[in-house]
Amino acid sequence: MTAPGLTAAVEGIAHNKGELFASFDVDAFEVPHGRDEIWRFTPLRRLRGLHDGSARATGSATITVSERPGVYTQTVRRGDPRLGEGGVPTDRVAAQAFSSFNSATLVTVERDTQVVEPVGITVTGPGEGAVAYGHLQVRIEELGEAVVVIDHRGGGTYADNVEFVVDDAARLTAVWIADWADNTVHLSAHHARIGKDAVLRHVTVMLGGDVVRMSAGVRFCGAGGDAELLGLYFADDGQHLESRLLVDHAHPDCKSNVLYKGALQGDPASSLPDAHTVWVGDVLIRAQATGTDTFEVNRNLVLTDGARADSVPNLEIETGEIVGAGHASATGRFDDEQLFYLRSRGIPEAQARRLVVRGFFGEIIAKIAVPEVRERLTAAIEHELEITESTEKTTVS
């Protein structure tokens, strides 16, 4: 059943991508099947029942928030009227998460407050063999500004909704990191509401976990909004990492830029499934969204055999009175010419490969506003490349 006080949050929302159905009620959704468009890439059998109602909560995730001046953290129940202002679940798992969480964490930056230090939010999973559901809302009030780092650790089976409410003329940089243990299944639905002249920088990083699927809906609720969505992912043998985005331009003179990059490395000799990444990027420009300027890009670098990348950009335009709109997608292996150039200058092949991958991800890492996160990602990529080299040596021997 829909929680009291949330009906108003549902009313008036223009459901995006062909008026996609949305509800807080899990029973309003059918159980997903592989033929469903939004689930056709997702390995449903590996979701441990998150999609069909059989995954009952047996544990809980722990959420801790660092203390900062002007930042308030609250724990609230499902009936709190603020919940759902960022958006409404558009799939069964997100609705299941909303129907099943025990308490929600609200992090609020006060009006006209500029938070100097990043706000750290650590989410620790319920543990191996346990299932949990969660809800997090980050709210930046009018003229406020903050950087928030949401860091996922530990393991287990977890589904949640994450809301980003950015009020008029506010600015939020949100860095979402999935650095789970190898046994983790995590499905996360993000809902962003961007006010008039507000700015959202949304960065997702996927490194760990068995199956990690992040779906993000970004909704402009006033003119002059600006959204930048960045993503970095690195899939190993057996991993499924999936990103699904929808940017809904419903007001004039808004901008959006999407840039996601991923690398994959598998092991054809392994009994595990192939490394698999999925990126689906939807941009909707409504008839009233004149003056829109938008572009989206997805690039994938396949490092070994036993890896597969699916990339699906979509652009729907209902008005011709825009500044610009476009998309690009490419998946390929190492550029042989780049490798040849580097090796011809005496650089060993392994080091040359590292340089190419560093350059591939460097554009995104440089855009992340938190030095500690940049350093961490650089180290993580180096570690992944060590795995690549180890796999290649084993294959050769």
Swiss-Prot record:
UniProt-listed PANTHER family: PROTEIN ABCI7, CHLOROPLASTIC
Gene Ontology biological process terms, A to Z: iron-sulfur cluster assembly
Keyword terms, alphabetized: Acetylation
Keyword Acetylation: yes
Organism of origin: Mycobacterium tuberculosis (strain ATCC 25618 / H37Rv)
Name under which the protein is recorded: Iron-sulfur cluster assembly SufBD family protein Rv1462
One Pfam family recorded for the sequence: SUFBD_core
Sites of N-acetylthreonine modification: T2
Family to which the UniProt record says this protein belongs: Belongs to the iron-sulfur cluster assembly SufBD family.
Extra information: Was identified as a high-confidence drug target.
